[in-house]
């Protein structure tokens, strides 16, 4: 497995891309995609934090694990976890139609999510982003950058 610091940097970079895409989509008619990208951005920030504590996982619902490992680091942990959990609860709904149960109407994310849903998701992501991104930047700045095979420094 790769170095946990490099894994953290990779998650931070990819989370940054997702967050910037969410910023572009915010306020457009693409509500489901705004939610999907905010959700992905926050998941990657949480995974960046977890990697720094030696935890690398493919799981998606990480708010409880994050709380357990970082409780002492954030005085607003309850609020942080509420925002992370709010995004985790969407699951795959922003990206895929749900049609398994005939007794329920088919869920079509691009049709069924609204502007208010996207705004709430963005607000949650923004809160988490403003708390975790500076934390990660500060911690990762204490580690030397590793050169890739192409000779470029990783952020």
Give a label for each model feature:
Residues 1-155:
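Terminal alpha-helical segments
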């Amino acid at each position: 497995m790769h170095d946990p610091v490099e894994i953290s940097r990779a998650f931070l970079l990819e989370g940054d891309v997702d967050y910037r895409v969410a910023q572009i989509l915010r306020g457009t008619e693409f509500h489901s995609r705004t939610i999907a990208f905010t959700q992905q951005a926050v998941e990657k920030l949480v995974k960046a934090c977890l990697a720094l504590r030696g935890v690398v996982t493919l799981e998606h619902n990480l708010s409880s694990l994050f709380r357990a490992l970082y409780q002492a680091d954030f005085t607003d942990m309850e609020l942080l976890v509420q925002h992370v959990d709010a995004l985790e609860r969407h699951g795959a709904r922003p990206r895929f139609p749900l049609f398994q149960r005939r007794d329920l109407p088919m869920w079509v994310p691009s049709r069924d999510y609204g502007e208010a849903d996207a705004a709430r998701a963005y607000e949650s992501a923004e809160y988490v982003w403003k708390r975790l991104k500076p934390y990660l930047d500060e911690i990762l700045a204490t580690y030397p950058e590793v050169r890739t095979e192409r000779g470029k420094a990783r952020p």
